[in-house]
């Protein structure tokens, strides 16, 4: 990994809220992560880029405690997360919005929204504020989760973690399979959350989308970070990204 991991960005003076050092992870006997190092500062949007199978999702799940077999260090506000339960990590204000969205098809939008408990100490986002971010949801409260479009399901998945009170959000491929107009709306929402002081770790293959909102990037390949750089360096990294992402 290059020195760009610590390059000065607008959020560079902010405190580091998440620090991952030497993170290794396994699924059964399959060794997936091979010493991942990354950091996220308060109020930043940081994006993990990489092809399918690079280890991006496993990195998020390892931070959240979903992957059982791990080694290395993951600290959140200087508190070690490895060894803590998923519930305990969530109570610290950390939330994961999974790629598969995990919307319950037989429950209404309202039931899905209120299903996870308010668990973070920071206090939940009000439903009124959620509906200003996602006005479509306020019009579909009684609709079944399975009747929502892909974009509406993604909005509901993000809204659900906001209502828990989490302030550190991990979003896994939030634009996957969505129409361009919905992708733009998701981008505006992430930018608004950043303005409100949320810290976001984003997994994306669509670096053109990420370029509009991310402060810094970490590029993964074969379970390792191979490069890290600030948004301002993106034009000079295009050749590397084309090779690393296959686009």
Spans of model-derived segments:
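Glycine-rich phosphate-binding loops of nucleotide-dependent enzymes
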Residues: 2-247
